Swiss-Prot record:
Origin: domain of life: Viruses
Residues given in the record as Zn(2+) 1 binding sites: 57, 454, 462, 464
UniProt keyword list: Disulfide bond, Fusion of virus membrane with host endosomal membrane, Fusion of virus membrane with host membrane, Glycoprotein, Host cell membrane, Host endoplasmic reticulum, Host Golgi apparatus, Host membrane, Host-virus interaction, Lipoprotein, Membrane, Metal-binding, Myristate, Transmembrane, Transmembrane helix, Viral attachment to host cell, Viral envelope protein, Viral penetration into host cytoplasm, Virion, Virus endocytosis by host, Virus entry into host cell, Zinc
Organism of derivation: Cupixi mammarenavirus (isolate Rat/Brasil/BeAn 119303/1970) (CPXV)
UniProt protein name: Pre-glycoprotein polyprotein GP complex
Designated gene of the protein: GPC
Length: 480
């Protein structure tokens, strides 16, 4: 009833469009011709029954939806931050930046070549050991803070200085248990696992030394932006206690220069994913602006904020990197840090903000809001683990598309007009078939012309009594 009322209200509007006029003409012709066919068929009551019976339509979904994924990299955004990667279970590398040719190796082993009796004891200043190399100084500071080393309470760090005859410096952390309640070894081991990922650990032959030395970067392992995020999160505790809740962090969108744009914009492909995959533009950003409870939205805001921050920095010095670090630490919410820490401690699948999956409609190109591809035991889950979730997401995507299409159609063409056109076409097709088939409408005397008024009964006589009972054979005739 509501559709009928809205239809009459929109009569002056829909005739302005050619499509609506064509639909109206087709509807009118189909109805008139259908009524004529119905009249000629001789079975009006049956036709009305066929029209009124079984007016239902089913719509199946899933034919044009596919399960797809993409991988993010932030090398172009965090190009000034160290990049971590693991070569094997005992050898790790920290690249000074994403564009640097220098690196810091972190070895976890059972032997150490640096002795405190012959070397220097590090108390927070690395200049004497690194040869006043500012790049290595701040990288060492980041790594040691990421390992949660406390210079005031933890065992001392020994180093072998960089000399003219020896271009290599070495730092050594002794993880030997000093007393029964000493948890320094477990703390460093947990921090290494958090920074570089899980590694094989033999309880019978434990590693008791961590050695760090300068080296060169020659693509020994594959970098991932997850490592940079882990290092940022590990260093976040240093500024966490001194910062308060700020009101400037909101979910409003802006352009590349920082100008507020509530409607959102399309992020560049190079910043998110490779050009051959998919650029998530206004659609995904608009969804994040309305509902920002997913990891994908967190990463988009993190990318966007740091892109603006990096473009406003004047140089690539240590002060600029520290400023960026504090900005990122302020950006990452306490809930985000706590959630990932708890998931790691509970050993349940967690999000590493690297790979995301989404449901894509192959015909229209519309897609759902990407969700994180979970990781468990250092490896991505199988596609089958997301089956129920992505089927449900597919249903939501179809429902959203149908709702959007309904609103657009109702705005341009009244839905009732489309329904009338459809059912009138069904009506015309049905009556045309009945007209072609035809139904017997009266009796004839076999082998003779039809007598008027030719309404004969089964005895061959007219029902009105004009003719006598002829008792001749009768046949049914169709009247066309």
């Amino acid at each position: 009833m509501g559709q009928l009322v809205s239809f009459f209200q929109e009569i002056p509007v829909f005739f302005q469009e050619a499509l609506n006029i064509a639909l109206a003409v087709v509807t009118l012709l189909a109805i008139v011709k259908g009524v004529l066919n119905l009249w000629k068929s001789g079975l009006f009551q049956l036709l009305m029954f066929l029209i009124l019976a079984g007016r239902s339509c089913s719509f199946r979904i899933g034919y044009h939806t596919s399960f797809e994924s993409f991988t993010m990299t932030i090398g172009g955004v965090f190009h000034e931050l160290p990049a971590l990667c693991k070569v094997n279970d005992t050898y790790n590398l920290v690249r000074l930046s994403h564009n640097s040719s220098l690196a810091l190796s972190v070895e976890y082993g059972d032997t150490g070549t640096v002795m405190c009796e012959h070397g220097h004891v590090v108390s927070g200043n690395y200049t004497e050991c690194t040869g006043a190399s500012e790049e290595y100084n701040w990288v060492l500071d980041w790594v040691l803070r990421g390992l949660q080393h406390d210079f005031s309470r933890d065992p001392v760090i020994c180093c072998e200085p960089k000399k003219k005859t020896n271009a290599e410096f070495q730092f050594r952390l002794n993880l030997t248990q000093r007393h029964k309640g000493d948890h320094y070894q477990n703390k460093i081991k947990t921090a290494l696992t958090h920074l570089f990922g899980p590694f094989a650990y033999n309880e019978k032959d434990p590693k008791i030394f961590v050695t760090m030395r300068n080296t060169t970067w020659t693509n020994q392992c594959v970098m991932s932006h997850t490592d940079s995020l882990r290092l940022l999160a590990s260093n976040g505790g240093n500024s966490f206690s001194g910062r308060g809740l700020k009101a400037f962090f909101s979910w409003s969108l802006s352009d590349s220069t920082g100008v507020d744009m509530p409607g959102g914009y399309c992020l560049e492909k190079w910043m998110l994913i490779a050009s051959e995959l998919k650029c998530f533009g206004n659609t995904a950003l608009a969804k994040c602006n309305l509902k920002h409870d997913s990891e994908f939205c967190d990463m988009i805001k993190l990318f966007d904020f740091n892109k603006n921050a990096i473009s406003k920095l004047n140089n690539n010095t240590i002060e600029a990197v520290n400023q960026l670090t504090k900005t990122v630490n302020s950006l990452i919410s306490d809930n985000l840090l706590m959630k990932n820490r708890l998931r790691e401690l509970l050993k349940v699948p967690y999000c590493n903000y690297t790979r995301f999956w989404y449901v894509n409609h192959t015909r229209t190109g519309e897609h759902s809001l990407p969700k994180c591809w979970l990781v468990n035991n250092g490896s991505y889950l199988n596609e089958s683990d997301f089956r129920n979730e992505w089927i449900l997401e597919s249903d939501h995507l179809i429902s959203e598309m149908l709702s959007k299409e309904y609103q657009e159609r109702q705005g341009r063409t009244p839905l009732t007009l489309v329904d009338l056109c459809f059912w009138s076409a069904v009506f015309y097709t049905t009556t045309l078939f009945l007209h072609l088939v035809g139904f017997p409408t009266h009796r004839h005397i076999s082998g003779e012309p039809c007598p008027l008024p030719h309404r004969l009964n089964r005895h061959g006589a007219c029902n009105c009594g004009r003719f006598k009972r002829l008792k001749k054979p009768l046949v049914w005739y169709k009247h066309h």
